[in-house]
């Protein structure tokens, strides 16, 4: 690309020109030319007028025309103009085509996102000979929407003026290699990607690859981002990149882009607390959550290069709550202290971006909702730009729909937002200010949100009317199914199929009837290009536990479109059911690549690795799972087992603590045995460190466990082992071991029926003997004889109790002797009891 940038490119990117720029254009002779007219129309928002211009007619019309597909015709016409026109210089031809591409994209956005309605038809700029191939405009639209299918994903059926997106695609994508004079071209291609993707049912790998390529190219154009103008454009660019990355599950890259935009803006944006009132009758100020925005530098951006605010009467109205108790907004005790600086368009877009990133990276939770509402209040406190106002209000309505006091406002507000599209009071130029930084949804998505809200409120008839008008048949089916009108859903789908057969309708019919033949029909109708058909067929197989067939269909679906997160997850589950752990590992690996914070996918991936005996990989994947979900006790349980398997004993101890946080009386004897064995036997862990260094941490863990699980003798015995089991050289360790073993013995003797079962009785006797030996060792180290005697007396009582129970339960009636199988144990107890008596007497003599 040439080093010098065409001067109008920066103005086009920001959506308006400065006086200085217009003066330069005049000096360069742009103003009086066709390029000057195109440029003026674009910057005025008169995109339709550009299509009636004679130059556009020349580019798109041809008197010599063979029968051919509309996309190849348009591409050939535009390429012919670029290569063969003799009236203009090559660079001028490139500039005109580029301006036509930008205008097509902007007009398409107006037709489907911002409004007001566009009065432009294909016959206004295409030759009649070409249009004669189609019986009506709808026929042409259907052909074009077929051409806009990517990776087997269909375009929304009521997309308006798809011819405009096709022209934009041809210029900004197909022939972009011919527009070498335009340095901002890849940025406009990125904007096209963002728009086209929002029309598709699923994410398109083709579009994502194109987006990444465009981002790399723009990053190399350093002269785009020079000076004050460049700084503001840099903020816009990084925000646009962030939204693209976010949509394609690239959360880390998105976060980095949002951070870069925030750094360039030099804003400090923090969630904080402030004293305030939320209700009309609240007497005292209490802590409220707010967003505090500060500038790091006192000097704001130059207003010359930032869009001028839109008059408030032209913005979507922020409706009052009209509640008799809750205030419309929080009333702060010290509002001046938290007064937000007067923000420009780019700065407000940064606040919105931080809000969006926060929403995507936090769980659905009441606290998260409150934090997001704080962001919307912040944004709505400075109503200046249509796109930002729309985005903030749409988010607020989603958050308020679950509140009984706010749901009525949410419905009224959503209706007002849906009506914005047809409102002609606000020009498209005002609506497009900062538009690509805000991810405003298309107008049908807003109407769909309204219908969903109406359905939740029980207004099923009104919701159905909207869904049917939008031809959102899946939602229509859901409405009827939930209302129990199963036959009605089938009837509507068959009526639509009589009008026109589409793969999507057959898939929906298959969902209703649970009939594989419908999916097969959709597959054939799509010429084996419908990822949805194979996806739906696979899900039916999965529901019927036909895992082999399910896997085959899912594999076909992801081959067409590998960016289907839910399909990879379900495919992994199907492979697990088939015990094909290699297949499940591959599927869940793709799943976590697409969505790195999917804890369940990480957990299932680790399960696959465990079954494949790749335990180190399992350990690492579980670490990732826990980063995503710190509260999931099943993941922690898998983690603790895997940690002990691979020798990560320190991690196992941490995991056990976390499980005690999550499940108060959690207990896993097997894990505790492994940890005790590792510490007592001084084993080495995975990194080569000796486990004995963990002795203190393990003792701390047992202290916590035994404070909650007090009645398990095995736990107390393991705790005693950590303290040396009474064989330590340290008297205090032996004392602790004795205490643990005493409690273990108490637990054993409090269990039921042990005294009547010879095997169980023998085991208790052996433990009592062991406890007595530890008591004797402890007594030896006591400096105070009375304490030593007390220790020995407690175990003597245990032994006497056992002798009594043996005599009571295991004495032969004829001989009067204790049962032979216990004879040796009873003899040992008698001898030990006598020894303890002698030792106690000796100690008493020291009093």
Curated annotation (Swiss-Prot):
The keyword rRNA processing does not apply. InterPro entries: TPR-like_helical_dom_sf, TPR_rpt, TTC27/Emw1. PANTHER family: TETRATRICOPEPTIDE REPEAT PROTEIN 27 (PTHR16193:SF0). Belongs to the TTC27 family. The keyword Repeat applies. Transmembrane segments: none annotated. It comes from the Eukaryota. The gene is Ttc27. Keywords: Repeat, TPR repeat. It comes from Mus musculus. TPR repeats lie at residues 457-490, 496-529, 531-564, 565-598, 600-632, 633-666. This is Tetratricopeptide repeat protein 27.
């Amino acid at each position: 690309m040439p080093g010098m940038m065409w001067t109008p490119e920066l103005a086009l990117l920001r959506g308006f020109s400065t006086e200085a720029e217009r003066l330069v254009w005049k000096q360069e002779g742009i103003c009086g030319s066709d390029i000057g007219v195109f440029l003026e129309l674009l910057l005025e928002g008169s995109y339709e007028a550009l299509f009636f211009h004679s130059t556009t007619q020349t580019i798109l019309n041809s008197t010599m025309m063979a029968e051919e597909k509309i996309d190849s015709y348009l591409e050939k016409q535009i390429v012919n103009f670029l290569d063969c026109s003799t009236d203009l210089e090559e660079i001028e031809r490139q500039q005109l085509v580029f301006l036509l591409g930008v205008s097509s994209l902007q007009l398409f956005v107006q037709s489907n996102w911002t409004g007001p309605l566009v009065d432009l038809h294909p016959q206004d700029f295409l030759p009649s000979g070409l249009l004669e191939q189609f019986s009506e405009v709808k026929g042409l639209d259907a052909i074009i929407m077929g051409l806009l299918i990517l990776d087997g994903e269909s375009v929304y059926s009521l997309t308006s003026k798809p011819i405009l997106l096709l022209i934009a695609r041809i210029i900004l994508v197909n022939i972009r290699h011919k527009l070498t004079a335009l340095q901002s071209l890849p940025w406009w291609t990125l904007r096209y990607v963002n728009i086209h993707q929002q029309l598709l049912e699923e994410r398109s790998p083709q579009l994502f690859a194109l987006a990444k390529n465009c981002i790399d190219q723009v990053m190399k154009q350093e002269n785009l981002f020079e000076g004050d103008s460049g700084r503001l454009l840099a903020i816009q660019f990084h925000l646009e990149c962030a939204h693209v990355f976010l949509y394609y599950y690239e959360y880390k890259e998105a976060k980095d882009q949002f951070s870069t935009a925030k750094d360039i803006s030099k804003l400090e944006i923090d969630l904080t607390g402030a004293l305030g009132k939320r209700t009309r009758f609240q007497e005292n100020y209490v802590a409220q959550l707010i967003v505090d925005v500060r500038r790091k530098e006192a000097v704001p951006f130059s207003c010359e290069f930032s869009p001028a605010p839109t008059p408030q009467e032209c913005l979507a109205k922020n409706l009052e709550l009209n509640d008799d108790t809750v205030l419309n907004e929080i009333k702060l005790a010290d509002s001046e202290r938290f007064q937000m600086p007067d923000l420009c368009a780019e700065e407000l877009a940064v606040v919105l971006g931080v809000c969006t990133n926060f929403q995507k990276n936090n769980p659905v939770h009441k606290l998260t909702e409150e934090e997001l509402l704080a962001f919307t209040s912040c944004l709505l406190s400075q109503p200046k730009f249509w796109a930002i106002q729309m985005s903030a209000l749409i988010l607020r309505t989603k958050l308020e729909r679950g509140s009984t006091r706010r749901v009525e406002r949410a419905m009224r507000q959503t209706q007002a937002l849906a009506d914005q599209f047809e409102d002609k009071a606000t020009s498209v130029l005002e609506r497009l200010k900062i538009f690509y930084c805000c991810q405003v949804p298309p107008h049908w998505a807003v109407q769909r949100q309204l219908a969903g809200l109406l359905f939740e409120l029980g207004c099923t008839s009104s919701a159905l009317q909207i869904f049917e008008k939008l031809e959102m048949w899946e939602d229509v089916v859901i409405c009827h199914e939930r209302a129990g009108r199963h036959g009605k859903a089938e009837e509507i789908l068959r009526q639509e199929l009589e009008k026109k057969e589409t793969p999507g309708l057959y898939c929906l019919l298959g969902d209703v009837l649970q009939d594989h033949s419908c999916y097969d029909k959709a597959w054939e109708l799509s010429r084996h290009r419908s990822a949805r058909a194979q996806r739906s067929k696979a899900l039916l197989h999965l529901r019927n536990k036909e895992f082999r067939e399910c896997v085959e269909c899912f594999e076909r679906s992801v081959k067409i479109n590998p960016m289907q997160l839910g399909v990879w997850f379900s495919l992994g589950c199907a492979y697990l059911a088939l015990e094909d752990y290699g297949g499940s590992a591959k599927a869940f690996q793709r799943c976590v690549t697409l969505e790195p914070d999917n804890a369940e996918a990480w957990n299932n991936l680790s399960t696959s690795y465990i079954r494949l005996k790749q335990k180190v990989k399992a350990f690492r994947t579980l670490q990732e799972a826990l980063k995503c979900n710190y509260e999931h006790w099943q993941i922690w349980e898998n983690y603790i087992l895997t940690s002990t398997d691979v020798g990560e004993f320190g991690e196992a101890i941490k995991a056990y603590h976390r499980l005690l946080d999550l499940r108060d009386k959690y207990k896993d004897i097997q894990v505790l045995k492994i940890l005790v064995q590792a510490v007592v036997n001084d084993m080495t862990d995975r990194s080569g460190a000796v486990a004995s260094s963990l002795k203190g941490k393990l003792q701390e863990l047992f202290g916590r466990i035994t404070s909650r699980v007090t009645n398990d003798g095995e736990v107390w015995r393991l705790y005693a082992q950590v303290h040396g089991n009474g064989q330590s050289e340290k008297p205090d360790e032996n004392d602790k071991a004795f205490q643990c073993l005493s409690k273990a013995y108490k637990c054993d003797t409090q269990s039921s029926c042990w005294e009547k079962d010879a095997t169980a009785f023998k085991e208790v006797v052996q433990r009592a003997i062991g406890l007595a030996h530890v008591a004797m060792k402890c007594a030896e180290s006591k400096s105070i004889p009375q304490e030593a005697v007390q220790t020995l007396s407690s175990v003597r009582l245990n032994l006497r109790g056992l002798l009594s129970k043996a005599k009571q339960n295991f004495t032969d009636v004829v001989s009067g002797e204790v049962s032979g199988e216990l004879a040796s144990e009873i003899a040992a107890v008698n001898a030990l009891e006598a020894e303890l008596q002698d030792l106690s007497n000796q100690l008493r003599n020291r009093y």
